[in-house]
């Protein structure tokens, strides 16, 4: 059933054979919708690759759980503002075990790493998915939270490096990076540090921002992401953000893997 849901998610198809067909129909009426026949009329090979390779193979690969594949895919879609597939991927993520409060935090996190407008575009889609599935305020994160523990030594080292490199020229950015990102956003408890890192790494690769990949991939692995999971996340992203972005990421990731203790 989850594979079939994924098929629909990938193409935003109307013929989703699940109990939620009627629930999702209303929210997609105003959005562009494709059927398998639509795709075959334009690109029959694409339809075959979608069913046989992407959904029949990539989404079934071991090494990265379906929940994590949904997190990676959502992060890529939001980072690139690709709204046509968001309704079904939000639904698929929920089916795969991503909680509404986690989706909320993913969108909030990506406002900082992919831009406010992209996050707001995701909100516009997610609100209808949440409404169709009766997701209420009790299932969402509160604004004021008890933050996760801060790695004081690691944060002091990061802050000192950034201050030394950029503090004199970009005081505002340096201040917000410390006060808002690493002493606030990253400590919100409704998205685990590992998952928050996975979202960040996925968004960086999705937008070809490799300069920040080394520290964030290291942070992800410090937070519990394994090398196998990181490799599979990059494999997943090849199909959603394109081979060139992934081939730009692989040398960076390979270097991170090689330099970490074994």
Q: In which residue ranges do the predicted regions lie?
A:
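Acidic, glycine/proline-rich low-complexity segments that act as flexible tails and inter-domain linkers
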Residues: 20-67, 80, 87-91, 95, ...
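Short, structured motif recognition centered on aromatic/hydrophobic residues
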Residues: 69-77, 86, 106-107, 196-204, ...
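A short structural micro-motif
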Residues: 78, 96, 109-116, 205, ...
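Alpha-helix capping and inter-helical loop/turn segments
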Residues: 81, 207-211
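Winged helix-turn-helix DNA-binding recognition segment
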Residues: 98-102
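Preference for long, well-ordered alpha-helical segments
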Residues: 118-119, 209, 229-248
């Amino acid at each position: 059933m989850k594979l079939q849901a994924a098929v629909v998610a990938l193409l935003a198809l109307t013929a989703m054979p699940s109990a939620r067909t009627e629930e999702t129909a209303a929210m997609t009426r105003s959005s562009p919708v494709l059927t398998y026949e639509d795709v075959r009329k334009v690109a029959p090979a694409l339809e075959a690759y979608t069913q046989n390779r992407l959904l029949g193979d990539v989404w079934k690969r071991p090494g990265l759980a379906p929940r994590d594949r949904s997190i990676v895919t959502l992060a890529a879609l939001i980072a690139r503002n690709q709204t046509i597939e968001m309704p079904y991927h939000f639904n698929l993520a929920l089916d795969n075990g991503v909680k509404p409060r986690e989706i909320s935090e993913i969108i909030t996190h990506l406002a900082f790493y992919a831009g406010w407008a992209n996050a707001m575009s995701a909100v516009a889609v997610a609100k209808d998915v949440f409404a169709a599935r009766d997701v209420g305020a009790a299932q969402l994160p509160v604004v004021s939270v008890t933050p996760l523990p801060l790695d004081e030594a690691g944060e002091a080292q990061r802050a000192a490096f950034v201050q030394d490199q950029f503090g004199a020229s970009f005081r505002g950015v340096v201040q917000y990076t410390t006060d808002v990102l690493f002493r606030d956003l990253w400590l919100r408890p409704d998205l685990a540090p590992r998952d928050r890192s996975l979202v960040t790494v996925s968004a960086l690769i999705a937008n070809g921002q490799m300069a920040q990949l080394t520290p964030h991939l290291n942070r992800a692995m410090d937070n519990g992401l394994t090398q196998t999971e990181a490799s599979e996340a990059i494999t997943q992203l090849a199909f959603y953000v394109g081979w060139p972005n992934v081939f730009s990421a692989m040398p960076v990731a390979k270097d991170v893997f090689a330099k970490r203790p074994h």
